[in-house]
């Protein structure tokens, strides 16, 4: 169905969520390659300067050094480029407000959604195809499946295969979280397509400053109600602050007896909450209380107009109440 819809449009825009991560850009690149195989004018609407995807973007430009056109466009450029022949494929997000350019959603009539986050009340309503699979480990896994079984099998470039492999790697925390049979099948396909495990590992190594900050976040963590690890972090003037916070949340799960970990990162008048668990706690329902979402073991939320300390207290209050009500 996706291929048939793409064939009837001349311009194809691929858009992810704000503050894109490896899964977001990897999935976008996979769809980009499919679209180019169908000889379509294709544009990825994404903030290419986001620190979380910097290694991938650098690799793309190295591999595309001889090509003139830029595969990434800004929100403003996308709004100017769109016309009646355009369609929009949204990856790794299904909430309109969390997309890179919500205005684009309103101005293009043919929309396809590919995502692995569970749908909430706030979801993209006017999609002609909505492929939302909460049991998938990542959107890259879903896109890899599409690329494997579609008639016009596109030939991925090495950096594109690397990006998709890294998307699976990051979202599964190195094949530990939500990695099913189809996850490994997708990874095997990407390896055959040119993904290199060593190259991907080098791509996502931490710099020393980030390592120190992550350690500091872990050191100041508070154990709440004997089973929740909570830490806060002022991310101003730290590149990739939300990524560091998410990595710290992952690391806190290694503490014995911890059912869930939460790292709150203050950045640009917003508090970003990274929530993680292994299997005993549904962090998604907790983050939904704050207008966020995600998965059973990996979720997030953004809080506006609140201080870091107040946000931490709000989280504690919510955890205690949900625990008393038997919701967690």
Where are these regions (language model features)?
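Short alpha-helices
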Residues: 30, 116-187
């Amino acid at each position: 169905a996706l291929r048939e819809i793409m064939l009837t449009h001349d311009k194809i825009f691929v858009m992810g969520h704000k503050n894109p991560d490896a899964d977001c850009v990897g999935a976008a690149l996979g769809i980009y390659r499919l679209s180019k195989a169908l000889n379509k004018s294709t544009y990825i609407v994404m903030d290419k300067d986001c620190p979380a995807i910097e290694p991938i973007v650098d690799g793309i430009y190295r591999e595309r050094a001889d090509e003139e056109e830029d595969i990434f466009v800004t929100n403003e450029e996308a709004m100017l480029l769109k016309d009646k022949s355009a369609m929009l494929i949204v990856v790794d997000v299904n909430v309109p407000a969390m997309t890179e350019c919500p205005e684009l959603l309103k101005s293009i009539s043919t929309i396809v959604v590919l995502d692995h986050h569970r749908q909430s009340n706030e979801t993209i309503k006017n999609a002609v195809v909505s492929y939302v699979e909460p049991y998938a480990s990542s959107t890259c896994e879903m896109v890899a499946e599409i690329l494997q079984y579609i008639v016009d099998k596109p030939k991925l470039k090495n950096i594109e295969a690397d990006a998709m492999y890294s998307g699976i790697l990051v979202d599964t925390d190195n094949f530990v979280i939500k990695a099913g049979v189809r996850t490994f099948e997708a990874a095997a396909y990407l390896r055959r397509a040119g993904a290199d495990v060593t190259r991907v590992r080098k791509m996502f190594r931490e710099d020393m400053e980030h390592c120190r900050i992550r350690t500091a976040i872990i050191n100041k963590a508070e154990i709440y109600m004997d089973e929740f690890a909570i830490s806060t972090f002022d991310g101003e003037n730290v590149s990739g602050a939300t990524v560091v916070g998410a990595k710290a949340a992952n690391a806190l799960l290694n503490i014995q007896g911890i059912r869930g970990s939460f790292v709150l990162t203050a950045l640009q008048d917003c508090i970003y909450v990274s929530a993680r668990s292994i299997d005993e706690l549904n962090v998604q329902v907790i983050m939904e209380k704050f207008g966020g979402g995600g998965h059973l073991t990996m979720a997030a939320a953004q809080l506006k107009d609140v201080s870091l300390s107040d946000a931490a207290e709000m989280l504690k209050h919510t955890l205690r109440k949900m625990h008393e009500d038997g919701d967690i």
